[in-house]
Amino acid sequence: TVEYNYNSNHLEGNTLTYGQTELLLLFGKVSGEGRLKDFNDMKASEVSVRMMREEAENRQQQLTQNFIRTLHRALLREDYTEYQTLPSGVQTSFVIHAGQYKTRPNSVITRYGDRFEYASPEETPALMSDLVDWYNEAERKGELTPVELAALFHYRYIRIHPFEDGNG
């Protein structure tokens, strides 16, 4: 899981080296320079990976929205405030709630400059319920390989983007 955590966290801007990541996750030690947040994020990522592995190994347990929210809470660790500058230059802030579905719309600018809007906050709980039901039924039927099931789940999940941050 060192390689997964290292690469996943670097996509989010984590500055730890591979060696620092390995030392932290395998031996619980810290070496060299690094932001405290980066070390904490890496440890939280490892906890989340372990939670997913344990959940996957427990074949008697179906996937639930509660597990997804608990996993998100473990990954983010705590609520925090996000600060942004709007195109008009106005400063704004809002709280990211760990383990809670989004309360604000979220979107991304595509490589073509278009804005892609994810599911609205109002739609999100029902869409997540549908997604979890679909996943559990698809797993029960066994018609998809684990890789196909994971890929389709991830695609549908990312299209919803249920949290304000930490959806990756």
What is each model feature region?
Residues 1-167:
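FIC/Doc superfamily catalytic core
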